[in-house]
């Protein structure tokens, strides 16, 4: 793995960048590419943004379609940056059969997942202890370019942190302390928390409410025995849907996940 200083040197000495988010892109990956990309643009870099498939309608309030493309141009960029993933298979629509383009290129990976089949010619910085790639980016960029993190960038990074943590429900222990410290720092930089809460967690389409009604009608409660405690059981409530029902109700996977 490379040091933060080595990653910074690559980003600062080069001029043209292609930033990639993984297929079926989630909030953390989408806002990681937009956040880092904006910081590079502030340094007069030329940045292009790519992901294999259109992001969810949940994220449409960002007007991402003005920047993020779903077809890759295979131009000779100085650096390809993979954010929130670490193998070609996560952007297979771009990489399958095109390894002769990707392999020789200088690449950077910034990620919070455990390593998979990482490509050659790649500088890598990862921390699996981080709850999101956006929180990892904040840690790096607040050291590298603190004066460039404005309200727009802070909002992107806060959105990635918020969505990957389940709106701060998934973190525990020391990680929880760190997550809230980062969130507080981003709010001090004028991250637009209300926009995030309203647009992602509160606003619902009529179709998504109908879909939620379907899930509630299928809700079941069962007793579940914990594998590590033979005599201890918990009540588990679950529901389910089929992919064909997403089409029927005209909702996508992220709309279903965010309820």
Can you describe what each PLM-predicted range is?
Residues 2-23, 29-58, 76-77, 165-259:
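Hydrophobic helix-and-loop "lid/oligomerization" segment in the mid-to-C-terminal part
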Residues 63-65, 69-123:
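Active-site cofactor/cluster-binding pocket
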Residues 112-182:
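Short alpha-helices
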Residues 47-49, 107, 157:
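Hydrophobic/aromatic residues located in beta-strands of well-ordered beta-sheets
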Residues 1-5, 97-107, 128-137:
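An acidic intrinsically disordered interaction segment
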């Amino acid at each position: 793995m490379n040091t933060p200083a080595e990653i910074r040197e690559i980003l600062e000495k080069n001029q043209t960048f292609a930033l990639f988010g993984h297929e079926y892109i989630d909030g953390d990956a989408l806002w990681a590419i937009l956040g880092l990309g904006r910081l590079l643009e502030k340094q007069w870099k030329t940045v292009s943004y790519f992901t294999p498939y259109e992001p969810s309608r949940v994220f449409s309030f960002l007007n991402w379609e003005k920047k993020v493309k779903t077809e890759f141009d295979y131009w000779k960029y100085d650096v390809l940056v993979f954010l929130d993933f670490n193998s070609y298979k996560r952007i297979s629509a771009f990489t399958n059969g095109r390894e002769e383009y990707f392999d020789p290129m200088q690449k950077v990976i910034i990620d919070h997942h455990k390593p998979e089949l990482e490509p050659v010619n790649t500088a890598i910085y990862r921390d699996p202890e981080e709850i999101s790639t956006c929180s990892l980016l904040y840690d790096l960029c607040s050291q590298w370019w603190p004066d460039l993190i404005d309200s727009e960038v802070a909002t992107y990074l806060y959105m990635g942190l918020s969505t990957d943590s389940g709106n701060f429900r998934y973190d525990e222990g020391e990680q929880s302390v760190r997550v809230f410290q980062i969130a507080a720092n981003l709010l001090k930089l004028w991250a637009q928390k209300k926009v995030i809460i309203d647009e992602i967690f509160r606003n619902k389409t009529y179709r998504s409410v109908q879909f939620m009604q379907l899930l509630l009608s299928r809700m079941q409660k069962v007793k579940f025995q914990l594998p590590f405690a033979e005599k201890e059981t918990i009540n588990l409530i679950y529901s389910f849907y089929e992919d064909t029902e997403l089409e029927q109700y005209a909702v996508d996977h992220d709309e279903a996940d965010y309820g």
